Amino acid sequence: MSRLRELHPRVTADEACGLFGFTRQAYYQGFRRGYDSSVAIDRILDAVGKIRKTHPKMGIRKLKVVLARDYAIDVGRDSLFDIMRNAGLLVRKRMRHRRTTFSGHGMRTYPNLIKEIVPSRPDEIWVTDITYLHVQGRHMYVFLVTDMYSRMVIGWKVADNMRDDNAIEALKMAFRGMNPQYRLLPVIHHSDRGSQYCSMEYVRLMKRHSMAISMTEGGDPRDNPIAERVNGIIKNEYLYPLQVTMAGLSMRVHKAIHAYNAERPHLSLNMNTPEHVYRTGEPTNRLWKNYYPYYDNLNILQ
């Protein structure tokens, strides 16, 4: 109808409505709905643009939660998908893996203590891993310590090498930030069998804090899935494409970890953030696949 009136400007709204078989009121209601829809889409895309500045790879489900939480925009998942697709804003996952574990070092290793455990609180199981970043032609490494219950990154260190002193710094950061209500309760430390985690100094630090030491049994990703998943999110959703100098890398990682911890909702955390669950200890949805039966970890720590 709008096209008709553009071609024939002398045709009145009443005449055009009669030609198409609907009333003038219905025409203006439809026009208003189209206008309101256009305004709503613009508002959604504007909010998505702001969110994506901090969370460049955030997907539809999490965007839906953040739009409602931070912008009071209630939009259906399918509608949001269509809006994002039409705007060319859908993202593809980046999947690459580089080996950072070298276990042929001859140092003592420890058994896997957590394959029969489902954590019931924060600071019950900490999982660790190392990921790499390619910066200005060099490989840099990020050492991460993650609370298994809340998925919160509680310790980290950026370095240009894989020595154990960097892993020690990440672990010390985790100790400094422990939730006070769990500080006197036992913690299991789970890692792969890399030399950093088997070194004399690192093991001494764990024992000084009365940690139970747990390690993977091999290359099975089921042995340390949470650490690998969190590392992948930090690296692929927040750090790539990595356009930063060596001097600015640590701050870039710091901002990425803050965005992940404090702003990104998790499906397995009832769409809460890791920081919220770590601080409050709220119950979580165990939506990841568990290959092992449930056991009380206090029996292991005694």
Task: Walk through the language-model features, giving the residues of each.
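Mobile-element integrase/transposase regions
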Residues: 73-77, 81-144, 168-173, 177-186, ...
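Conserved, non-catalytic sequence blocks in retroelement Pol enzymes and Pol-derived host proteins
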Residues: 57, 71-72, 118-120, 135, ...
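Short, amphipathic alpha-helical "recognition" segments used to contact nucleic acids or chromatin
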Residues: 1-10, 45, 49-53
